[in-house]
Structure formats: structure tokens, C-alpha cells
Amino acid sequence: MPFYDNVYYPYPSDPPGTHSSAGIPSLLSSPQSQPSSGSQSRPAPSTMSGPLTSSGASTSIPPPFKFRSRRENVDWRRINAVDVDRVACEMDFQALQEHINAVTFCSVEGERCHRCQSPVDPALIKLFRLAQLTVEYLLHSQDCLSISLQAAEERLLAEAREREQICVQLQKKTQDAKALKEELKQRKKIIASQQAMFSAGISANYHKCQHCEKAFMNASFLQSHMQRRHPSEFDMKLMTDNQKKIQTVKLQDEINKLQEQLTLVTSQMETQQKDYTAKQEKELIQRQEEFKRQLEIWKEEEKMRMNSKIDEVKQACQRDMDSINQRNRNLETELLKLQQKNIQESMQSVQTQPNASTSNEHWQEVVKLQQKLHKQEVKWTGKMQKMKEDHDREKSLLQEELCKVSSAVSEGMEESRRQVQELSHRLQEQQQIITSQNKQMKQISSKPPTITVQREGVSTPSPETKAKVVVSEQSNSVHKLDPIVELSEEDKDSSSISESPTENRSWQKEVQELLKNPGLRRDMRLAAQHNLDDRLQSLGIKGVSGLSKNLYKSSMTQIISDRRKKLEEDPVYRRALKEISHKLEQRVKERNTEQPVKSKLHEQVVQSRPRSSSFPSTVTRVMSGPASKQQRTPQPVPRSRTNVPHKTSTPLQHRRTPPFSSDEDSSEEEEEEEEEEESSDEESPQMQKKTVLVNSSTAKAQNTAKTQSTAQSVRSAVALTSAEPTNVTTLSDSDWTDGSEMEEINLSQLHKHTDQNGNLKNVTHSNVKALGKSLEKQLAARGPKKPAGGVNTFLEKPTDVRNTRQNAKKELKYSDDDDDDDDDWDISSLEDVPAVAKPTQCPVPVRKSLDKSQDTSTSVWGSSTGKGHKPGLTDAGTASTLKSSLVTVSDWDDSDEI
């Protein structure tokens, strides 16, 4: 038998008819395997054989053969009880059958001799195991053979039974065939006799049945056949012809009656159907007419209700708008009164010279009041905008409802269309007015007044007799103006020299006339915002929203902590910062020494040209006394304080990335700012002194190169912020393009950090504090001396500066206390401006714009002549009074620690 991998695969069973499987001698199925008692029954198969099925067709092949494991112990008592010789002599196969499982599947490997306890010989064990495997294989072969034999026997029995059934059927068929043959013979005989009769010509005596195929030789036979086989037809035939006629007449009468009844019923049904349809049509017409009348009534009611609602909404909106406008006008009048009062008090304070503490408290109260007014205005403007949006939303909903009944309210729709046309016409007129006003503003901005700096002669170095800056006073009503118009350098220089006082006066008159229009500021602001958005979108800059104050604070605290950890842990980082700061300081010195000295003609007269079409901010005339005023040419003599003219643009500035420059340039500038600021802690006092002197001289040289600036008050703020490098971070001249933003500088905020002599107080910033102390120690011995020809650019009292916001810019606001909301981050600039420096004693509230329609920003530094400066020319430790609304997390400026 075939084996593979110790598994037996038997051959297929032999086809029926062969006796090879039956003829193979078996150990247990042989005739000698019968018990000695003489019983003729077959022995049962071995215990390994599975259950057999009843039929050969359903008999399944036994599972594949596999040798079993031997785990059973040897039952020596049963084996000792067997007499092997007797079994061999008597051929007792029954005893072998009883012990075959125990012998075949027992394990003798662990058996030992009972006497000496020695293990069994391995050769003997091998022989015994071989015998066990042979017996197991023979048992499996026996099972397979018995199964195949039983299946063959079952098939044989089934075929025998089928053979018997076929034999019985065959006998029945033969008998039926014999009977059919006899019947066929008889029919043939009858047919032959009938054909013979027909052919003999005896058709006259032939009578055929009309209802069947039979024919009779005699009429009597046919009649008897009719009575016997067709009785109904026979009775009908016996009836007379009269009876048939009478019956047909009756049937015809009944048919006629039924037809008449049918016609009558159909006519009645038709008339009823016509009446019913006519009635239904009348009812339907009446219902339609009634529905139309109800629909018309409903349409009229809806139309009246909608019109009443629209009128109510219009009246409510008009009342709200009137109340808001009235409140706004009241606030504006109060603001103007407060400003005039502040100006008068400032003039009185200049004459009386009150102490610094009372003036600071007074100005703090003024700033707080201004902030409150600004917040109220923002609040009311937001409410007004919300009400307008609600009104527009309700109006749209009402229009949608009106569209659903457009057939009934066509007149109302026409009226609304006329209103829309009128509004569009008004809007076009307003746009035309705005464009014309923009043109006028541009013309006016191209002709700014000439502002001359007059200073008094100083005979003593005492602080009380310092020369004050005397400038022309302008109107307080400064508003938003048109976008920036860039001029070439030659045009700037030529136009700045050729302007005269008459042009200044005419320019101021035109400005005042234009600003009398109350809706001008709002219209110009909207136009400026649209122009800025379009310009930014054309340049590929998408609109961004600024960070909130809480998010900014949390981000900056995390950045500062990470930066400090990095400085403490990594010495290489500290060393690299020192090296870079030293290199930057050297570059600053080289750049400052290379600045050319301008001609004295430009130093005599400081002319201001607005950077944009915005008007100059409010300027207060400051007088130090009745001393004679005369124009003197400032001499570039080194001074103890870096008091520079109003138009100076010193290198002590934080260069800022232009609004439309690449991110790589801005990142480089930020890195250089950080490195230069951190290098300030390592500078020696002597180096700081030299830097200040060089900056003051170069600032004078750059004075005449500036051809566009803001009003004189803004210039004084610029001079103050540039005088102490630890207080203000200014913008580079290259920032002021058509798409750049204008900054808002509150002069009162700056004067809160100054004393009576115009010197800046110490701030909380560590670098600023150290640098300020070093400068004070070096300059303490010199006292309050002012060099000959010097000009004091610091105002004794703060002036109210309102910056004009340009149409193409969004405002930058000062950093405030915790009450600042997300409105401080509404700028869409890409620049990072460090936060404002706070004083050491107490946080002074800063001024916010009082009126967004009036709150405008002006250029702090004027023309773009400083474009030659590279990013990174920043003063070490310079803090900022401005805060950008867009703060990047990667900003490494030291001023962020404030």
C-alpha cells in the first residue's frame, strides 16, 4: 500500500465484478479465524475500523493512515495469562483479537527487568516497535479491505434487487405485447371486411350515425343505437316542426324585450351622467372663484402688513441712527472742548511751571478720559454697525417673502428698485466726491507749509533758561486723508526749498475748508481701506488677523523663558551672541562715520512735507520767555544729550522690514536687531558715549535729506523718542511705501517718561536701565549745559497729538493694560514692532485714538532717504513705544521681555 510522510493513502476500490479485494486473505476474515464453537458468523472488524454506511454508494474512504503514539503501559498479568503455544496450536484468533490492541499500542521503552532492574535491550525494543508498526499497518489494511468488501457486497445486493425488478417488468411487458397483437389481428379482420363491403356496392343499405363514426346495415339498428347512445338527440328528432317554430318565436320575443330594456337603461344612465358632470363643473367653478377672492384678500393683507413692518423697521433704524449721530456729535464737541482746555492748561502750566508730579497726574487723567471717550465711540460705532447689519438682514428676509408673492406686490418691488437706484446714484455721487476730494488732498499735500525752527539765545546753562522750539500752530481738527504719494528725491529737495509762508497759509485754509464736511473722514477711511486691500491682494499678500493680547502674552512669556534657558544652558550660544553684537557695533560705527555732512543751508530751515496727503497733527506753541527770537543755524557740536532736530533720522532706530519685503529679509533684520540689543550689556561706557555723539552728528547730517514728514508735534515726538535710544523704536525710511502702514505716536505718552529738563526717565527694561545709568554717570559732571548753537527739541509740556491715519494703512496702537481687547490687533502689516517700554514706578495709561473717523496716522520719520541703511543698524537695548498688531513668535527682540 502507498505511504507518504507516515500517512497511508489506499488505492481506489476495485470496480464491481472483480474479486481481487475479496480474494485477498485476511488475518481475521479467513475461514480459520472462526471461533472453535463452530459459529458461522463473520468476526467483527478491528477497533480501528470506523462505522460503515448501509449503501456502497455512500461508503466513504477511511481517513489517511498515521501511526499512533504509544503511551499505554504493559498489562503483564494478562500477557502472563495467555498460553502462546496453545493459541498457535488451536489457532485461537479470538484471543489474538482480544490482546491485539494492548500489544500493538503499549510502550516498552520504560520497562525494566523485575529481577535485576536492568533496562530492555535496545535491539529488542527496536524489533518490538517494528512488530508493533507492522501490526498497526496490517490492522489498517484489514479495515480498508473490510470496508471495501462490505461496500462491494452492498452494491451486489442492490444490483440483485434491481435485476429482480427488471425481470418482473419484462414479464409484464411481454404479456401486454401478446394481448395487443391479438387485438390488432381482430381489428385488421374487421377493417378488411368493411372495406370489402364498401367496395361491393352495398352503400344503399348502409346507415351511418350522425353523432358518431358507426355505420349500420339496417335502419332499425341505427335507431336502437340512437336511443341507446344518443337519447337527447333522438328526442329532438322526434319533435314536430310546429313545435320548433313556436319555440323559436318565443325565444325571439324574449330577445326583443331584453334589447328594449337595455336601450332604455342606457339612455337613463347617459342623462344622469350628464347632469352629474354639469353639477360637478359648476361646483368646481364656484370653488375656484371663492379661492381667488380669498387669495386676493390675503395678498392685500400681506402687502399691507409687509409695508407696515418695513415702515416700522425704517423708522426704528432712523431713530437709532439719529440718536447715535447725536451722541457722536456730543462726544466730538466734548472732545474738542477738552482739547482746547488741555491746550490752555498746558500754556498756563508753561508760564506757571507747576511741579512734575501734578502735571503727570493731570495728564494721566486726561489720557484716561480720552481712552474712555475712545472706547465709548468704538462701542457706539459697533452697535451702529450691528444695527445696520440687523436691518439689512431683516430687509433681505422681507424681500424674500415679498418675492414669493411677487404677483401681488409688483408695485412695491418697483418702488424698492427705484430706491436701490437712488441709493446707487448717491453712492456714485459720494464716490465722485471722494475722488475729487482725494485729488484736492493730493494737491494740498504736495504743498505743505514751511516750518522754521526758532530758538532763543542761551546765556546761562541753567535748565530754566533752555531754548524752546517755536513752531507755527495749526488747527486741532486733523482727520484722515488720502493714500501716500511718493516723490523722487530731486522733487522733494526742490519743493521743500521753494515753498513759502503764503503757500502755507493757503494750504491751511484749503485743509480747513475740506475738513468742514463731516462725512469726509468716514468716506475717506472706507476708500483707504478698500484701496489698501486691493493693493495688498494685487501684491499677493493675503489678509491676516492679529494675535489677541492674551495669546501674545502667553506666547512671548514662553519664548522669553525658552530664550533664557538657552542662554543659561548653551555657552556657545552666548559666545555667538557676543561676537555678533560686537560685529554689528563695529558696523554701526563705520556707517555713522561714513555719513556725509550736509550743507548748512539745509540746517537753517527745517521744512516739513507730509509723507502722505495727511495733514499735520496738532502743534502747541511753546514759549520759554519774552526773550528775542531769531533764526540761527544749528552747529554740529557734540552735546551731552542727543537732542536732535525734528527732522533728524538717527541710526538709533530699529530698522523694520518693509511691508512687502520677503520673509527672509525680515528674519535677517530681526536677528540683527536681537544681536545688537543683546550686545548693549557688554558695551563699555566710553563706547556708549562715542556712539551717542556720532549718532547726534549723523542725525544732523541727515536732517536736510528728509523731504516728507508729519506735523511739527509729531516731529517733536520723533525728536524725543530718538533723543534717548532706550525709549522709542522708529521705522526705517524704506518702510513708507504706498502699501506700508502709518504709526500712531502719542506725545503725551512720551512726555510721561520725561522730567522738566526733557530727559527720559529710567524704564523697566534691563538693557535700557543699564545703558541709561551709564550715560547719566558719564554726563552728570557736565550738568545741564547746552552747547552753543544747540536746539532744545523737548517740549516742557505734552501736547495733544492726533495722528492721521492714511487711507492705505491701518493703525498701530499703543500697548495698554489688561483692558486692551482684540481691536489692538487689527493691522494687516507684516512688520514686527517691539512693545512699549513701561516706567518703573507705575504703569501710565497710554492714549488711544479718540475717534476712529478722526484717528489718523502720519509718517513718523518722513522721506525715504534712509533706504541706504541696511537692516541691523539698531541701537543696543532700544525699547519700543509702539506695538504691532501682528506679532510673530520668531521675534527675537529684547524689547519683548517688557
UniProtKB/Swiss-Prot annotation:
GO molecular function terms noted in the UniProt entry: BBSome binding; molecular adaptor activity; zinc ion binding
Coarse class of the protein's main subcellular location: other
UniProt KW Nucleus keyword: yes
Compositionally biased region (Low complexity): 25-46, 495-505
Highest taxon, organism lineage: Eukaryota
Cellular component terms (Gene Ontology): centriolar satellite; centriole; ciliary basal body; cytoplasm; non-motile cilium; nucleus
Region annotation Disordered: where it falls in the sequence: 14-66, 435-509, 585-739, 773-878
GO terms for biological process, alphabetical: adenohypophysis development; axoneme assembly; blood vessel development; ciliary basal body organization; cilium assembly; determination of heart left/right asymmetry; determination of left/right symmetry; embryonic heart tube morphogenesis
Biased composition range(s): Acidic residues: 662-684, 816-826
Xref: PANTHER family: CILIUM ASSEMBLY PROTEIN DZIP1, ZINC FINGER PROTEIN DZIP1
Protein name: Cilium assembly protein DZIP1
Gene that produces this protein: dzip1
